[in-house]
């Protein structure tokens, strides 16, 4: 998931 508060680490 490249969007949101953390655009990295998570899908």
Swiss-Prot record:
Pfam families: Periviscerokin. The keyword Secreted applies. It is found in: Secreted. It comes from Perisphaeria virescens (Cockroach). Keywords: Amidation, Neuropeptide, Secreted. The keyword DNA repair does not apply. One of its GO terms (biological process) is neuropeptide signaling pathway. Its main location: secreted. Expressed in abdominal perisympathetic organs and abdominal ganglia. Belongs to the periviscerokinin family. This is Periviscerokinin-1.
């Amino acid at each position: 998931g490249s969007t949101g508060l953390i655009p990295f680490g998570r899908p």
